[in-house]
């Protein structure tokens, strides 16, 4: 069964207090780089996989998309999206992205923010996206970096005084399920290598345009713990085009 942690009331409440949940795209440390990878939305049909609060759906509409479909497994996420970002041309649909069925060539742009590392069968999803996109269509997504997902618990190693020593990277080439800790709770994620992310895209007809390991923006460097984000990559951004 696909995990839906975000409909747990206590977990969702903690998520809602995160900086990015409160401040949206401008509160996301990778947004300044992710935005650079996005294509022109003018007149485009856009699909957002794992749309969450709908921030990216609203962004696409503000940039003159013709139609936006935002899908998410979480009822609570979509309720918030509809409250914050309702629009006649934005449709929100509750479904796991792995279960989504759409007509071939039905979208011009597909994007996804920090959701694909929750997907067990990445290759099957890439196949579906290639089918849904028109020729020349764009797929842009962010995931947790393979360095960040490899070990599992996603926490630093500390000394006896609680000072950070280093970040563990282990079992890198053993892809598959990890029991991560997020918001003090155990969450299932799926680790895969950088090679798998990129080669799978090329195998299914995508041309790689950009690969970015985003650094935190300067204006966030004084936030608690942000300087430590320079010690290892946390996120990976990829932009490709269907050829």
Regions found by a protein language model. Give the residues of each.
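Conserved class I S-adenosyl-L-methionine
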Residues: 1-41, 55-59, 80, 84, 139-176
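Acceptor-substrate binding/catalytic loop of class I
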Residues: 143, 147-156, 181-196
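Class I SAM-dependent methyltransferase SAM/SAH-binding core
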Residues: 47-49, 53-100
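A short acidic, Gly/Pro-enriched loop at the edge of an enzyme's catalytic core
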Residues: 98-110
């Amino acid at each position: 069964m696909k995990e839906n942690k975000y409909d747990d009331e206590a977990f969702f409440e903690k998520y809602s207090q995160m900086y990015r949940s409160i401040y949206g795209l401008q509160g996301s440390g990778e947004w300044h780089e992710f935005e650079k990878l996005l294509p022109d939305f003018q007149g485009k049909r856009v699909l957002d996989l794992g749309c969450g609060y709908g921030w990216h759906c609203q962004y696409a509409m503000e940039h003159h998309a013709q139609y936006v479909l935002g899908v998410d497994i979480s009822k609570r996420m979509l309720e918030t999206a509809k409250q914050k970002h309702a629009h006649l041309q934005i449709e929100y649909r509750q479904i796991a992205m792995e279960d989504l069925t759409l007509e071939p060539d039905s979208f011009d742009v597909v994007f996804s923010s920090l959701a694909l590392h929750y997907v067990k069968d990445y290759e099957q999803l890439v196949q579906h996206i290639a089918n849904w996109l028109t020729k020349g269509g764009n797929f842009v997504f962010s995931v947790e970096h393979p360095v960040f997902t490899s070990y599992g618990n996603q926490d630093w190693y500390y000394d006896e005084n609680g000072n950070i020593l280093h970040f563990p990277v282990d079992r890198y080439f053993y892809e598959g399920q990890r029991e991560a800790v997020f918001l003090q709770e155990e969450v299932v994620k799926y680790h895969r290598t950088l090679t798998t992310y990129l080669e799978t895209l090329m195998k299914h007809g995508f041309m790689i345009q950009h690969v970015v390991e985003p650094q935190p923006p300067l204006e966030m460097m004084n936030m608690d713990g942000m300087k430590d984000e320079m010690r290892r990559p946390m996120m990976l951004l990829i932009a490709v085009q269907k050829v």
